From Swiss-Prot:
Belongs to the hunchback C2H2-type zinc-finger protein family. Keywords: Developmental protein, DNA-binding, Gap protein, Metal-binding, Nucleus, Repeat, Zinc, Zinc-finger. This is Protein hunchback. The lineage of its organism: Eukaryota, Metazoa, Ecdysozoa, Arthropoda, Hexapoda. Residues 92-103 have a biased composition (Polar residues). Gap class segmentation protein that controls development of head structures. Residues 16-59, 88-108, 151-192 are annotated as: Disordered. GO terms for biological process: segmentation. Residues 173-192 have a biased composition (Basic and acidic residues). It is found in: Nucleus.
Length: 192
């Protein structure tokens, strides 16, 4: 969610390189909506905790941080290649936070940690419980599907023997094949 906001910032910033300050203000005015939509869109990932509500509160804090950070980042943006910033912003890593200045450490991780660990605690529990349950289920389903496929494939394997049988019949009756071939070739000649 934080990284998605920064990704949105980064996507907008290359456009705003020449009009950094004007564009940045516009983008910041739009950002509560963008970040809210991002947080709501990504809240399923973060589990529907009161994550939509904290973002609305933290967005104000975040905007203040972002205003400081963006001013710093705008300088960094012009210095650093975009890829490194994208990678740094996509992964809110300690190095990224260090780059963004210590403002993020006291500031962002508090809303982030208040939201994330609460989300991460249920989600690992649910994920760890469900994927093992889901994975064996998926595995068994896949195995069943494979069994069904294998059960279906023997008919498929049985039909090729039929086609050799047909080929044997055609070999036994080569004239029909030649007639078919000649007819088709003649039709092709006529068609041509």
């Amino acid at each position: 969610w934080y990284s998605s906001m920064f990704a949105a910032n980064i996507k907008q910033e290359p456009i705003s390189h020449h009009h950094h300050h004007h564009h940045a203000h516009h983008s910041r005015r739009q950002h509560p909506h963008d970040s809210n939509s991002n947080s709501n869109a990504s809240s399923p990932h973060q589990s529907p905790l009161p994550s939509p509500n904290p973002p609305s509160n933290t967005n104000l804090q975040l905007e203040q941080y972002l205003k400081h950070q963006q001013q710093q980042q705008q300088q960094q943006h012009q210095q650093q290649p975009m890829d490194t910033l994208c990678a740094a912003a996509m992964t809110p890593s300690p190095s990224n936070n260090d780059q963004n200045s210590p403002l993020t450490w006291p500031g962002l991780p508090n809303p982030m940690q208040s939201i994330m660990p609460a989300n991460l605690r249920p989600s690992p529990n649910t994920t760890t419980t469900t994927p093992p349950a889901a994975a064996p289920a998926a595995a068994t389903i896949a195995l069943q599907a494979n069994d069904k496929l294998q059960a279906l494939t023997p008919p498929m394997d049985v039909t090729p023997p039929k086609s050799p049988a047909k080929s044997q019949q055609s070999c036994a009756e080569p004239e029909k094949e030649h007639d078919l071939m000649s007819n088709s070739s003649e039709d092709m000649k006529y068609m041509a």
